[in-house]
Amino acid sequence: MADLKVTQIKSSIGAKKNQRDSLRTLGLRGIRKSVVREDNPQNRGLINVVRHLVTVEEV
């Protein structure tokens, strides 16, 4: 499977608790911070919860 580069583009201020928790679980701690994660159903689910706060690229 490919890897996914996830970049936070919007602040988590005002987001619901489960959305903030999903960002932390992905390893994102601020705007314009990026992480590379394996492309699997668990990570896709976390990304889906915060899809309005992040961008995703295949690496």
Swiss-Prot record:
GO terms for cellular component: cytosolic large ribosomal subunit. GO terms for molecular function: structural constituent of ribosome. InterPro entries: Ribo_uL30_ferredoxin-like_sf, Ribosomal_uL30_bac-type, Ribosomal_uL30_ferredoxin-like. Keywords: Ribonucleoprotein, Ribosomal protein. It holds the Pfam family Ribosomal_L30. One of its GO terms (biological process) is translation. Belongs to the universal ribosomal protein uL30 family. PANTHER family: LARGE RIBOSOMAL SUBUNIT PROTEIN UL30M (PTHR15892:SF2), MITOCHONDRIAL RIBOSOMAL PROTEIN L30 (PTHR15892). NCBIfam families: rpmD_bact (TIGR01308). Part of the 50S ribosomal subunit. This is Large ribosomal subunit protein uL30. It comes from Nocardia farcinica (strain IFM 10152). The gene is rpmD.
